[in-house]
Amino acid sequence: MKLIAAYLLAYLGGNSSPSAADVKDILNAVGAEANEEKLEFL
């Protein structure tokens, strides 16, 4: 769920096609760990 939330935050922030690195950066900014396996699915 946190991956989807981070993806949507990036999208709402103006990034029309957030990458896995963008999502990972958002999660790292709040101290959450990114599951690499699920992150690659995006």
UniProtKB/Swiss-Prot annotation:
Record-linked PANTHER family: 60S ACIDIC RIBOSOMAL PROTEIN FAMILY MEMBER (PTHR21141), LARGE RIBOSOMAL SUBUNIT PROTEIN P2 (PTHR21141:SF5)
Molecular-function GO terms, alphabetical: structural constituent of ribosome
Subunit structure comment from the entry: P1 and P2 exist as dimers at the large ribosomal subunit.
InterPro entries membership: P1/P2_N_sf (IPR038716), Ribosomal_P2 (IPR044076)
Source organism of this protein record: Triticum aestivum
Record-stated family: Belongs to the eukaryotic ribosomal protein P1/P2 family.
PTM comment, free text: Phosphorylated.
Record-given protein name: Large ribosomal subunit protein P2
Keywords noted in UniProt: Phosphoprotein, Ribonucleoprotein, Ribosomal protein
